[in-house]
Each structure stands twice: as structure tokens, then as C-alpha cells.
Amino acid sequence: MGRFHRHDDRTEHTHDGQEHSHSHSHSHEDLGDHASYETGPERISVLERIFSENDAAADANRAAFAENGVHCLNLMSSPGAGKTTLLERTLAHLQEIGVRAGIVEGDIETSIDADRLAGYGAQVVLLNTGDGFGGECHLDAPMVRKAVGGLDLGSLDLLIVENVGNLVCPAEFDVGAHTSAMVYAITEGEEKPLKYPVMFRACDVVLVNKLDLLPHLDFDLELFRGNLAQVNPVAVVFEVSARTGDGLQAWHEHLTTMVSV
């Protein structure tokens, strides 16, 4: 029995405590004494099928976006990092410059965030994941595909998927986005890129938010940047305050460039 493991290159295998080989190269020297869980062939088969079906749906989403000339951004973060506040300011800017935006708003329960975003001229579709035990902690490609059915893709330039607030799971599931970004609040500390590397590694853009709180916190911005560089040296980093608007101009220019490509 072993531990199921999925890598950034989307290959999968189990660790059984013995030597193993597979089609991609990476080092396990840094695995340390991680807790493992027992799996059997049935569990592995189910996980492989889930990822395979999701990846097929993600490819279909990307094809639909390409057909309609839509750039898709997957926006992720922990709960409370400031995604929705950032989106409010971003949508207001996009409305001013004539970029036609749509939002897929993911939350376990309520329409609170979707209601907040509805006043900025964007098409907004709500995805509540609360059915089942506690609700899904992420959006996946089939969910997004279903939500996109409620949008007029042909009238959009940009689709933003605001994923469910969670620092791990959303990064595991390809939703068909062209760009992945995350909002990271300085209240979360400097060490999270090292402790929870999956999302940081998966993102093209990291928006370091709540910079207006920096004078009141013992947050070392350079240490955070160094930790981030260890897991993702090529991520584009913006230091912003969604509350005050500081730093957002550079982010807006970057986003506009992505949409126009």
C-alpha cells in the first residue's frame, strides 16, 4: 500500500516505501516525515478518473473560451485574503476602460460576494458548492463549464473565476483558465509559501494584499518574497492594498495586457 501523489506536471503515482520509477524526474529527498495514508488500487483508480475527467472538461472550457476570444483568469486565496474587495476595484476599472468582464463566483454558501460584484457592469454567475458534507472546498472544470452556460461568452473579453476560499484545494483542479493568480494577505505570515507550496507554485501572479496594515504587523516582506521565490521564482508579484487602492494600477495594467494578447 502507498500514498497517492500528484505532481505539478500532472503525473500521478503512489509511494510504497520502496524504490519506484515513473516518467517524470523529481527528488524525494525533501519529503521529510510527512504523514501518509493507506490507499489501494480502487482508491487510486477513482482519483485518477476524477483528475482525468476534470482535465478533459478543462480542455473543453479552454476551447470554448478560445472560440469566443475570452481570456480566463482563475483567482484563488485563503478565506478573507481580500479577493472580493480586489475584484470590486478591478471590475470598476475594467468598466471604465470598456473591458467586458464576466464572473463565476464560487462560495460554499450564500450570494454575499456575488451580490457585491453585481453592481460593476459584469455578468455574474453564482456557484454554491454547499451540497454534500460541508461543501466542496474548490471549483472544478465541470462546475465552471456548467456556470459558463449562464453567461453570454460571445459578449465577453475576460472571465474571472473567483474560486472558493482555500489555500490548497483550488490549485489542484484545472478549471480551464489561461492565467492563475492568488491574493495573499500579509496577515497570513511569511512562511506560507513553504508550508503550503501547491497554490504558490501553480500561480502566474501573486497579489500581496493588505499592505496598508504593514506598519501595524511584524511582517517581513522581503522574507516572504524570498520564500515565494524558493517555490516559484517566476511568479509576477504585485504589492497592493485592495482597501486603499495603493498598487492596483500596475495590476490593472498587467491584467489589461493579458486580455489584449
Q: What spans do the regions from the language model cover?
A:
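Canonical P-loop GTPase G-domain recognition
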Residues: 214-261
